[in-house]
Amino acid sequence: MNKKILISTGGSGGHVIPATIIYKHLEDNFDVSMTSDFRGVKFLNKDEYNLKIFNVRPISKNLLIIPLDFIFMIFLIFKSISFFRKNKIDTLISTGGYMSLPLCLGARILNIKLLLFEPNMVLGRSNKFFLSYCQKIFCYSNNIKKFPIKFKNKIKVIPALLRKNFYNKRDYNKSLDTINLLIIGGSQGAKIFDDLVKNAIIELAKNYKLKIYQQTNSINFESFKKIYEDKNIQCELFNFNDDVVNFMQKTDLCITRAGASTLAELNFTETPYLAIPLPTAKDNHQFENAHFYNKLGFNWLLNQKEIDEKTLLNKLINIIDNKEEYLVKKKNMKDFNYENTWNNINLKIISVINEN
């Protein structure tokens, strides 16, 4: 009988996308199911996954409501224990976030094997809390910030997780002769990408021929399309859930936030990028993600608090005009990617699950 694996996720795309990738890695070898809260469901095609809704509310900062949240959490822990017993789960894999708390606590109480996943270069708070209980934690590097030295032996380094369609499309032949510019604001959106970046592009288009692929909220589609077309700028707009690999294939340069999944995809497709990390990200993890790859020579990095339209415009002009530096970054990415194959990651994850 196959082992029963439960993957816990929810919240933003940064938690959900890796969970779906792990699911696909395991579904041929194990009996796999997934839990998500209501927020995470919008990033999922429910027909593809054995999915159960397990909604967890964030802990309130209101002192009057905290006791109710505590009672609700106790209820969810007992619900988790019941779920584990009923479904005879052997291993829980958590992608982090507060929505994983009751399930991880339930796994701890029942002595169920617990594996954690940390895609960021800073250890998340939920993962830190359960580090002493877990058997292993999957990371992209041994040098994770805020990681306790005494638990370093629990790190299992794997190549960055990518959706399988990225491996099927490897013809990434790009140059800056025609500038195809991709703009990715992340699953939570970004007003700076809708305003400041858009204005910089309009100025840039006065001297360069551009084709814009921009991720934005669907409510902006008509207004953005009109603005770009009025300036004779070709554009294609898309939502977060659209197949981003199709846009990366066409892209010369990307302006992006610094979520771990997005950076992994850009690195793999050898798409040099200008990273503008979300300054309000917990523990400043987006900056640390971008900084890690910046040291490897993959990207350019700007601090949102220090840029305006002119700064961004000048940076883009400098990148476009300096083709030698651009090509060096592409080569650095190519050299980095040689170990990232679907089968290699498959073997690493499965070997950890099968460890006693």
From Swiss-Prot:
Q: Which InterPro entries match?
A: GlcNAc_MurG (IPR006009), Glyco_trans_28_C (IPR007235), GlycoTrans_28_N (IPR004276)
**One term of GO molecular function:** UDP-N-acetyl-D-glucosamine:N-acetylmuramoyl-L-alanyl-D-glutamyl-meso-2,6-diaminopimelyl-D-alanyl-D-alanine-diphosphoundecaprenol 4-beta-N-acetylglucosaminlytransferase activity
Reaction(s) this enzyme catalyzes, per UniProt? di-trans,octa-cis-undecaprenyl diphospho-N-acetyl-alpha-D-muramoyl-L-alanyl-D-glutamyl-meso-2,6-diaminopimeloyl-D-alanyl-D-alanine + UDP-N-acetyl-alpha-D-glucosamine = di-trans,octa-cis-undecaprenyl diphospho-[N-acetyl-alpha-D-glucosaminyl-(1->4)]-N-acetyl-alpha-D-muramoyl-L-alanyl-D-glutamyl-meso-2,6-diaminopimeloyl-D-alanyl-D-alanine + UDP + H(+)
What is the top EC class of this enzyme, as a single word? transferase
- Topology of the protein relative to the lipid bilayer: Peripheral membrane protein
- Gene Ontology CC: plasma membrane
| SUPFAM superfamilies assigned | UDP-Glycosyltransferase/glycogen phosphorylase (SSF53756)
Q: Which of this chain's residues are annotated to bind UDP-N-acetyl-alpha-D-glucosamine?
A: S12, G13, G14, N120, R163, S187, Q286
Pfam families, per this entry? Glyco_tran_28_C, Glyco_transf_28
UniProt-listed PANTHER family: GLYCOSYLTRANSFERASE (PTHR21015:SF22), UDP-N-ACETYLGLUCOSAMINE--N-ACETYLMURAMYL-(PENTAPEPTIDE) PYROPHOSPHORYL-UNDECAPRENOL N-ACETYLGLUCOSAMINE TRANSFERASE 1 (PTHR21015)
Q: Quote the function comment for this protein.
A: Cell wall formation. Catalyzes the transfer of a GlcNAc subunit on undecaprenyl-pyrophosphoryl-MurNAc-pentapeptide (lipid intermediate I) to form undecaprenyl-pyrophosphoryl-MurNAc-(pentapeptide)GlcNAc (lipid intermediate II).
User: Could you tell me what this protein is called?
Assistant: UDP-N-acetylglucosamine--N-acetylmuramyl-(pentapeptide) pyrophosphoryl-undecaprenol N-acetylglucosamine transferase
Q: What's the source species for this entry?
A: Pelagibacter ubique (strain HTCC1062)
